[in-house]
């Protein structure tokens, strides 16, 4: 039975190395996903701010285009 221990130890060591390798890849993937999420959040915040400004500008344009007729100067007389 003592002769089987080195083989068993080698199998356990190989399994441990495989698990450590997988863990390393998982940690790398998690870091990459965290960075991608942070970038997406920044992009979303920038887009929300841009939309807010565009809606403000659109409101100003609408106010100008659809002002009350009372506020308009009279048409020229020919």
From Swiss-Prot:
Disulfide bonds: none annotated. It comes from the Bacteria. Belongs to the SlyX family. This is Protein SlyX homolog. It comes from Xanthomonas axonopodis pv. citri (strain 306).
